[in-house]
Amino acid sequence: MQPNDITFFQRFQDDILAGRKTITIRDESESHFKTGDVLRVGRFEDDGYFCTIEVTATSTVTLDTLTEKHAKQENMTLTELKKVIADIYPDQTQFYVIEFKCL
């Protein structure tokens, strides 16, 4: 069995598969992904594979520079997105946006 390249919380799986979630915002430990990378995607909770994505763009962002566009790409409100990011990455300010599409 091949290892997964990136994981998402299970609660995001349906939105990813339906194309409602088209970005992920990560910390520096996952800043190495590049446009064109093809990644196996698993669930964080059990590492179970559920799809393959292609990275379509990457950029940097801070909590203060998150926009409504980012929120829409995450299928959340901007307030929800800022809270989720702050909860997952407390005390961090610099983040990496990975835009993707399911293959």
Curated annotation (Swiss-Prot):
Q: Does the keyword Hydrolase apply?
A: yes
Q: Name one GO cellular component term.
A: cytosol
The record, for InterPro entries, names: AC4CH, ASCH_domain, PUA-like_sf
Q: Name one Pfam family in it.
A: ASCH
GO MF annotations, alphabetized? hydrolase activity, acting on carbon-nitrogen (but not peptide) bonds, in linear amidines; N4-acetylcytidine amidohydrolase activity
The catalysed reaction is: N(4)-acetylcytidine + H2O = cytidine + acetate + H(+); N(4)-acetyl-2'-deoxycytidine + H2O = 2'-deoxycytidine + acetate + H(+); N(4)-acetylcytosine + H2O = cytosine + acetate + H(+)
Taxonomy, superkingdom: Bacteria
Catalytic residues (UniProt):
K21, T24, E74
In terms of CDD domains, this protein maps to:
ASCH_yqfb_like
Query: Which keywords does UniProt give here?
Result: Hydrolase
The EC number on file is: 3.5.1.135
Q: Which HAMAP family match?
A: ac4C_amidohydr
The record describes the protein's role as:
Catalyzes the hydrolysis of N(4)-acetylcytidine (ac4C).
What's the family?
Belongs to the N(4)-acetylcytidine amidohydrolase family.
Please state what the protein is called: N(4)-acetylcytidine amidohydrolase
Q: Which organism is it from?
A: Escherichia coli O127:H6 (strain E2348/69 / EPEC)
